[in-house]
Design a protein with these regions (language model features):
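N-terminal secretory signal peptides and thylakoid transit peptides that target proteins
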Residues: 1-18
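N-terminal Rossmann-like FAD-binding beta1-loop-alpha1 element of flavoenzymes
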Residues: 45-71
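Glycine-rich FAD pyrophosphate-binding loop
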Residues: 64-88
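Dinucleotide-binding Rossmann-like beta1-alpha1 core, especially the glycine-rich loop
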Residues: 92-191
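Active-site/ligand-binding neighborhood in enzyme catalytic cores
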Residues: 188-313
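C-terminal segments that line or cap access tunnels to active or ligand-binding sites in enzymes
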Residues: 267-278, 334-336, 341-511, 517-542, ...
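Conserved beta-strand-loop-beta-strand element in the redox core of flavoprotein oxidoreductases
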Residues: 311-331
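Active-site-proximal substrate-binding core of FAD-dependent oxidoreductases
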Residues: 552-594
Length: 595
């Protein structure tokens, strides 16, 4: 198996990165350089944003629009886990390098904050900016193994009048969808739909005090159901989608996500179809235009700089210790600081004095992360797969995937990328790194990079080639690329620079707010408490808006506050939730909860 994913890649770019100057280096209070377009006014308040993922870029965007001078510090590359990247050494004959990524992007219609930002990023020829680069796959598939028939179906999207939302109408609609897609025994389908109704009609207090403490496995009574029920509705929903074990995942988190998709499928409260992806590699469609727009607003970037410590003195953040590309350490100062690093990296930068100033920061140590990382397979022939996402729910490593070239209509894949031999990219997410595979009997972490690639390929074939048709063949495999954020595979100490926040029971109580007790320090990232309650790009975007609003309040600014769009609440169900609040306070079950 030819591999291009075994070498380590360091993402440090930009000729200006090696230059000195943060927002202000200690002893050198340089103002931000002028940028094309409307930059900050002389004497504008200065903000340092730590991290250039979706959270950091969103914060920079909102602040720059409000006249702040923003400098963003990023260790590797703009876009964080959302970015796409080049496969090193893969370009031939004037083509672009093969496109790769940490994991495929998924921007469902339940998102509202991120799409709003996308509409405000100009893109040539698009009236609605980057948002116009979203396309909707037509179908999805649960790919089964061991000869079981795959479950393939269209993605419901009414596109016209929304469905009714009385409990009985919801029951009928969901039962019909589940019976069509999943082929479970009717009594199990009916039971699961009733559990959905329990959650949909539960009051906020019950959700936060009971369902947050209840594992999803227990909530859906998986232990007493068939193996098919467990695989699809317990494990398949949690491990493959939110990278959390069903036996541990918070029902509030899983239920909140499920509720949003139920409303989306029924045509309620959505920005668009339930499944949307970008019509180009992520950097081409989104991150590169975003960078260009932010630079036009005067945002400055320091790429290749590592944040070492957020320092605290005299009741405020006094500066941030950073290390430049040359290894030299300096201190940058500003009026305000937004920490937009992933939680596992951010908490290492919080000094003891800073933690003492706000105990909420210490609770972030209890937040848990796990591995969910991508690998891409480049094919010399397009496989006859589903026209959308597929979920290999029987795969030991919880694989999900999508074949991408058909969704990029403005690109001729072999003419535009690589050496001309690869015609498509099958992008796969690996959500389970701690269970043995089918080839070597080892976990993904115990395998070498080459063994991971072979094992994932074998598991894909086990799910896709088991019903009489060979959809994937070894002869069509051109090469592969494994996310360079993982290192040390096959050694006693594997590492992952891009772990994902997971949601075991009780996670809600340890999520911080965007504003801290330190008046000039704010938090932004998918671990911050926002409405969606899930580690997503939407959560990162919403948290950045909340952080900016908190900063504006602390600054006494008269600038307009960012709109933070909440999750949709169906008006028809509010009466049921009020009734449930009354029952909950009396110590009674939800009216639909029959055990």
């Amino acid at each position: 198996m030819a591999g291009t994913g075994s070498s380590r890649r360091t993402f440090i770019a930009g000729a200006g990165a090696a230059a000195a100057a943060g927002v202000a280096l200690t002893g050198a209070g340089a103002a931000p350089a002028a940028a094309a377009g409307a930059g900050p006014a002389p004497g504008a308040r200065r903000v340092v944003a730590l991290g250039a993922g979706v959270a950091g870029l969103t914060a920079a965007h909102e602040l720059a629009e409000r006249g702040y001078a923003v400098t963003v510090y990023e260790r590797r590359a703009l876009g964080g886990k959302a970015r796409s990247m080049d496969v090193p050494g893969s370009a031939r004959g004037g083509r672009r390098p093969l496109p790769a990524e940490h994991g495929f992007r998924f921007i469902p219609g339940i998102y509202h904050n991120l799409p709003d930002t996308m509409r405000r990023i100009p893109f040539p020829g698009n009236a609605a900016g980057v948002w116009d680069n979203l396309v909707a796959p037509r179908e999805m598939m649960f790919a089964r193994a061991a000869g079981r028939e795959d479950l393939r179906g269209p993605i419901p999207w009414p596109g016209h009048s929304p469905a009714g939302l009385t409990p009985e109408e919801i029951r009928r609609a969901l039962a019909g969808i589940l019976q069509t897609l999943l082929r479970l025994p009717p009594h199990e389908t009916a039971y699961f739909v009733d559990r959905v109704l329990v959650f949909l009609t539960s009051c906020d207090e019950r959700r936060e005090e009971v369902w947050e403490r209840t594992p999803w496995w227990d909530f859906v009574r998986a232990e007493r159901m068939s193996n098919e029920y467990r695989r699809i509705l317990a494990v398949g929903i949690t491990r493959n989608i939110v990278a959390t074990k069903a036996e541990e995942a918070s029902t509030r988190t899983v239920g909140t996500l499920g509720e949003a998709f139920v409303f989306n499928v029924l045509g309620r409260g959505a920005d668009g179809p339930p499944d949307r992806i970008l019509d180009l590699p992520t950097n081409e469609a989104w991150i590169d235009p975003w960078e260009a727009h932010l630079r036009s607003l005067g945002v400055e970037f320091r790429i290749g700089w590592t944040v070492r410590e957020v320092r605290y003195a005299d009741g405020r953040v006094s500066g941030v210790g950073v290390e430049g590309p040359d290894g030299a350490r300096q201190t940058v100062t500003a009026d305000h600081y937004i920490s937009a690093l992933p939680v596992e990296h951010a908490r290492r930068t919080w000094s003891a004095a800073l933690r003492a100033a706000d105990p909420m920061l210490g609770r972030c140590d209890r937040l848990e992360t796990d591995w969910m990382t991508g690998i891409q397979f480049y094919l010399t022939e397009r496989a006859e797969l589903v026209h959308g996402h597929l979920n290999c729910i029987d795969s030991p490593w919880s694989l999900t995937a999508i074949q991408q070239a058909e969704h990029w209509p403005s690109r001729d894949f072999p003419a535009d990328y690589g050496d001309g031999a690869a015609v498509d990219c099958l992008s796969v997410d690996i959500s389970e790194w701690d269970k043995p595979g089918i080839l070597y009997g080892k976990t993904a972490k115990q395998c070498t990079r080459e063994e991971v690639a072979r094992e994932v390929w074998a598991q894909l074939k086990a799910s896709l080639n088991d019903t009489g048709r060979a959809l994937l063949t070894d002869s069509t495999l051109h090469s592969w690329f494994l996310d360079p954020g993982v290192d040390g595979l096959g050694t006693p100490h594997p590492t992952n620079q891009d772990e994902l926040l997971i949601h075991p029971v009780g996670t809600l109580y340890n999520r911080p707010t965007a504003g801290t007790r330190v008046p000039n320090f704010f938090l932004s990232g998918d671990y911050v408490a926002v409405d969606i309650d899930l580690a997503t790009m939407e959560g990162a975007n919403a948290s950045a808006r909340a952080a900016v609003n908190s900063l504006l309040d602390r600054d006494g600014s008269d600038a307009a506050r960012c709109t933070v769009h909440p999750m949709y609440r169906a008006p028809e169900l509010e009466a049921a939730k009020r009734h449930d609040r009354w029952r909950y306070r009396l110590g009674l079950r939800n009216v639909f909860d029959l055990g």
